[in-house]
């Protein structure tokens, strides 16, 4: 027998914590006005019948739902949430567009990461690194009768075959979990209904996990340029490419095409690449990429693109025009992919950039609609989307309201050389803690002693001077992402510099440097240095 409950949709999940803390019997507890998102959380494998408030504010009417959870978007966060929800007994459906390798507007099961993001990009990174390794091998006695050549067409075909395989795996995972996969474009009709290609589906909860799409600035000739989606699936390898942007996507593709022997020019509006990263890392990676032949054009903003009679392209900036490009690529950020979903028509609030506004539990302004991943523009990383999806399922189907934990989230830039980081930058640590100790190492790795190449490694620890806790860990050099992933556990556990010092290193390795740096490169004492000083003097002394 179904139970009808009337609750206020405006209440937050914090009500649950308050209710649990009160000395009430179960009947009294159930009479409290709990949020709709927490009703019937333990109900398994059945259609929910509750009282849903009508949009015009009239008396609630009984509602019958096809699913407990309906998800729009089959990317990393959505798949995690759907699969876990199904495992907990919920009836789940998901809608996604057909497979496509090029456009974020036509995606496929697996989303950005699997089809036009992390996975294909990393495969391109692997392909491009061989040229550097061929150069390194000469110093180790390797000789080649002829210079190795790269077959772009066969590589792209192999890459696409792998993406198809991964998409198939994702579909099998959903199928085995009992999730209904619906192919098509989903659009919100009301807080509990989604239209997929003309057919309506109702659900107690709706999750939006549609990710993001590349952003191209509105300048004359922008239609002549490509974005990061297209760059992963070009019919021919660039001969000379202009990459507009100074973020991680720009640097990763700069390294890729440089390794594949294209002439690479990077145009950035700022003085430095990677805004938001540690300042020393920013300087070091640009220097190392320049040594490898990549040309950086700083403080240059794109103004127009033109095409010549010979088919080449010219890029005009505020400082002049550079001609002769076979490709011009924009890596100028991404935007949440919230267009044509009907979100605002049902009351979901969006930020200026189109991101879905959510609370700390991933709930939108509409009580029955939730959102995770890049579409919320919180921390746009695949593992973070997975975490958000897992936390949401605990909130909805395990009677365990759970917030995603964003402290000490590691990240990487698969540039060449790559970057790994976790925790605070030096600049952030100074602002938050004031007194900090900085440990750095800048050295030539063992491999470079025989290769003869000018490769170097930079490593950095940011330590709180008062508590000795390691606040930040940064590295730029070979295998940096792999090394930093392990140390992320240490920062998550709030280990101290003394813990690092007490750890035996692996020799010879670059990683051991993190546990053998004993003497601070510099000590920043914001409280002491600011005493008796003001203005720019105090800021400079504090390292700001």
Curated annotation (Swiss-Prot):
EC number(s) from the headed UniProt entry: 1.8.1.7
Composition-biased stretches (Low complexity): 532-544
Subcellular location, principal: plastid
Cystine crosslinks: 113-118
Record note on cofactor: Binds 1 FAD per subunit.
GO molecular-function terms, A-Z: flavin adenine dinucleotide binding; glutathione-disulfide reductase (NADPH) activity; NADP binding; thioredoxin-disulfide reductase (NADPH) activity
GO BP terms: cell redox homeostasis; glutathione metabolic process
Binding locations of NADP(+): 246, 249, 252, 269, 275, 333, 412
Pfam families linked: Pyr_redox_2, Pyr_redox_dim
Keyword match NADP: yes
Catalytic reactions of this protein: 2 glutathione + NADP(+) = glutathione disulfide + NADPH + H(+)
Keywords: Chloroplast, Disulfide bond, FAD, Flavoprotein, NADP, Oxidoreductase, Plastid, Redox-active center, Transit peptide
PROSITE patterns reported in the protein's UniProt record: PYRIDINE_REDOX_1 (PS00076)
Gene3D superfamilies given in the database record: 3.30.390.30, FAD/NAD(P)-binding domain
Binding site for glutathione: 76, 170
Binding site for FAD: 76-77, 96, 112-113, 121, 186, 374, 382, 507
Cofactor(s), by name: FAD
Feature: transit peptide: 1-52
Catalytic site: 507
Miscellaneous information on this protein: The active site is a redox-active disulfide bond.
Family: Belongs to the class-I pyridine nucleotide-disulfide oxidoreductase family.
Quaternary state and interactors: Homodimer.
NCBIfam families listed in its UniProt record: gluta_reduc_2 (TIGR01424), PRK06116.1 (NF004776)
PANTHER family: GLUTATHIONE REDUCTASE
Function field: Catalyzes the reduction of glutathione disulfide (GSSG) to reduced glutathione (GSH). Maintains high levels of GSH in the chloroplast.
Protein name: Glutathione reductase, chloroplastic
Organism for this UniProt entry: Glycine max
